Amino acid sequence: MTVTDIATRTYNHGWRLDPIVRSLLDTDFYKLLMLQMIREFYPNEHVTFSVINRSRHVRLAEAIDEGELRAQLDHARSIRFSKNELIWLAGNTFYGKTQMFSPDFIDWLATFRLGEYELRKVDGQYELHFHGPWTHTTMWEIPALAILNELRSRQVTKGQGRFALDVLYARAKAKLWAKVERLRKLDDLWLSDFGTRRRHGFLWQRWCVEAAKEGLGPAFTGTSNVLLAMDNDLEAIGTNAHELPMVAAALADDDTALRRAPYRILDQWRHTYGGNLLVALPDAFGTQAFLRDAPEWVADWTGFRPDSLPPIAAGEEIIKWWKQKSRDPREKLLVFSDGMDVDSIEETYHHFAGRVRVSFGWGTNLTNDFVGCSPDGTVDLDPISIVCKVTSVNGRPAVKLSDNPEKATGEPSEIERYLRVFGSAGRVRAPVHV
């Protein structure tokens, strides 16, 4: 385990010792899983990803220097997969399977680089877009968000002295360790790190992962961050994301094809992967709509990752559906990852005990919880809700409805069309904090 004096390294950031993105493996594992499938089934689709700051009260273009942002984005474009990284991807076992990634895909990754970006300032915010083949724009999502979040953190800490930084990180470490001490009281807990995209910084995420591994032992099942999984001998965790049904839906030529789109791309997923990777994300166009129209084979999948309803309500809805399909929920898996923290993890764990297998993806509240830690009382280190979503496919607008209308993305006219096709049943508006 590498021991890093985070306060000193933070103090020295002004001397550019730390590029934010160090490796193309500094991404979520499901990006590589999806990339392999995208390359096979959708090699020619032109897809635009756009950064969306849902915390509009934070004016990112005023908080982050444009020159520093461009320098970090340009640095990310200069990175390639190293030979050792490709050997590890090719030879490692993921989810119990050897050669998860084909030799042809590994060879293709050897020449991969991130594409160009479009950046401008508009009314105190950055408009940041990535245009190009889906095989390349998809890989911008995680590094772009990590860069924005860490530059914001660096700007806040830049003016703090060495002693103040010591206090800041000491408090944040104590706060996290108190959470770990509570969580390790839960028998047979399954918990993993999902915190890359909105982390405080790379070094801090690394410390959080090491602390969770040390404090939780076998209950800490791994991390979504591929680089940290490789460096810490952990399982790389992840399945698939909203971008799959969003792109499939945008490609649909009529309403019938639109309604079938989420299942068509999941059918391609199940023919690419199997076993524990058969975990569906049901809420892109509403969970109730997804369950209502789902083919019978979806009920045979390992489980679901409910993402935008309160966890207990979402879990109960899926358990009810499994029972209607004559499937035993005790043999199924629910992965909860939407804004989870120690309180909601404990509550959800106890609620479903003995009724269904549950695991938790611990994200922003693991890797970016500095609330109340700053010696000067600033709230500028509080996490914000920032995403990078598909916004167009071959020139057509893309849409995400979500179970929470506050998380919906897309042009209003297209959102209305999708609501006509999928319906609005089960959607509940709630504040989005992370």
Curated annotation (Swiss-Prot):
Q: Which EC main class describes this enzyme? A: ligase
Post-translational modifications reported in the UniProt record? Transiently phosphorylated on a His residue during the reaction cycle. Phosphorylation strongly increases the affinity for substrates and increases the rate of nicotinate D-ribonucleotide production. Dephosphorylation regenerates the low-affinity form of the enzyme, leading to product release.
SUPFAM superfamilies, alphabetized: Nicotinate/Quinolinate PRTase C-terminal domain-like, Nicotinate/Quinolinate PRTase N-terminal domain-like
GO molecular function: any one?
nicotinate phosphoribosyltransferase activity
This enzyme catalyses: nicotinate + 5-phospho-alpha-D-ribose 1-diphosphate + ATP + H2O = nicotinate beta-D-ribonucleotide + ADP + phosphate + diphosphate
Which Enzyme Commission numbers does its entry carry? 6.3.4.21
Q: What pathway is this protein said to act in by its record?
A: Cofactor biosynthesis; NAD(+) biosynthesis; nicotinate D-ribonucleotide from nicotinate: step 1/1
Q: Name one GO biological process term.
A: NAD biosynthetic process via the salvage pathway
User: What Gene Ontology terms describe where this protein resides (cellular component)?
Assistant: cytosol
Post-translational modification Phosphohistidine, affected residues:
H242
Keywords assigned by UniProt? Ligase, Phosphoprotein, Pyridine nucleotide biosynthesis
Keyword Transcription found: no
Summarizing the function annotation, the protein's role is: Catalyzes the synthesis of beta-nicotinate D-ribonucleotide from nicotinate and 5-phospho-D-ribose 1-phosphate at the expense of ATP.
Q: What NCBIfam families does this protein map onto?
A: NAPRTase, PRK05321.1
Q: Which family does it belong to?
A: Belongs to the NAPRTase family.
Q: What is this protein called?
A: Nicotinate phosphoribosyltransferase
Q: Which organism is it from?
A: Nitrobacter hamburgensis (strain DSM 10229 / NCIMB 13809 / X14)
